[in-house]
A protein has these predicted regions:
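A generic structural motif
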Residues: 29-36, 86-89, 137-138, 143, ...
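GT-A fold catalytic core of metal-dependent nucleotide-sugar glycosyltransferases
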Residues: 42-100, 106-111
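Catalytic core and acceptor-binding pocket of nucleotide-sugar-dependent glycosyltransferases
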Residues: 109-178
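Hydrophobic/aromatic beta-strand patches that form the interior of the parallel beta-sheet core
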Residues: 4, 30, 59-61, 85-86, ...
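Short glycine/proline-enriched coil/turn segments at helix->beta-strand junctions
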Residues: 24-28, 53-57, 80-83, 153-157
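Short, solvent-exposed loop/turn segments at secondary-structure junctions
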Residues: 8-11, 35-37, 65-67, 90-93, ...
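N-terminal anchoring/stem segment of glycosyltransferases
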Residues: 1-43, 54-55, 110-111
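A structural signal for well-ordered alpha-helical segments within the folded catalytic domains
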Residues: 18, 44, 48, 142-150
Length: 178
């Protein structure tokens, strides 16, 4: 299985890549280190995978994760054509109703999600600002998970991994609940 992770910018060093390479050595890990388009910022570069000509499920994940226990169950969790599997949102950065995912992990068939990539590319700047401007999340760069969730619901079935498989460590509860 192919796993794609984004490390653009200097917030996370190469040690994060090394960690994931070790933990995911049974998989084919691909790194997105440069924007695929100069207009696309940071984590929004996950959209690139939705444009790949791959007709099998792939995983797309954040780099700032700690994998413990039977974590391979996450990557091996079944997904069918017409579905998009996501990590449940165990913390919220929005008060808006109707959002249930965390953008830290997706599994899908890229060919099924090509319409999401196309939609994004039609208005890159607009979509990167949309969820910030509408008060769904805070800037300067956020909102890609809301864009994906809204777009998935247009044509695909959104499936969530079991909630009890995930947690977040935070210094303060107000970080978890904002």
């Amino acid at each position: 299985m192919k796993i794609f992770a984004v490390r653009i910018g200097d917030k996370y060093g190469p040690e994060y890549e090394d960690y994931l390479e070790r933990k995911l050595s049974d998989y084919e890990v691909h790194w997105i280190r440069e924007p695929y388009d100069d207009r696309v910022t940071l984590q929004w570069n996950k959209m690139k995978v939705m444009n790949l000509d791959i007709d099998e499920p792939v995983c797309v994940m954040d780099i700032d994760v700690l994998l413990t226990g039977n974590y391979k169950e996450i990557f091996d969790y079944p997904v069918e054509r017409g579905q998009c599997l996501a990590m449940p949102g165990w913390w919220r950065d929005t008060e808006k109703e109707g959002y249930s995912i965390n953008g830290g992990f997706f599994k899908y068939y890229p060919k099924d999600c090509k319409y999401i990539y196309d939609k994004f590319m039609l208005d890159i700047h607009g979509w990167q600002k949309h969820y910030i401007d509408n008060g769904v999340t805070r800037g300067p760069v956020n909102g890609e998970q809301y864009f994906v969730e809204d777009s998935v619901k247009e044509r695909l079935e959104l499936k969530l991994l079991p909630n009890e498989w995930f947690t977040r460590w935070a210094v303060s509860e107000d970080i978890v609940n904002r």
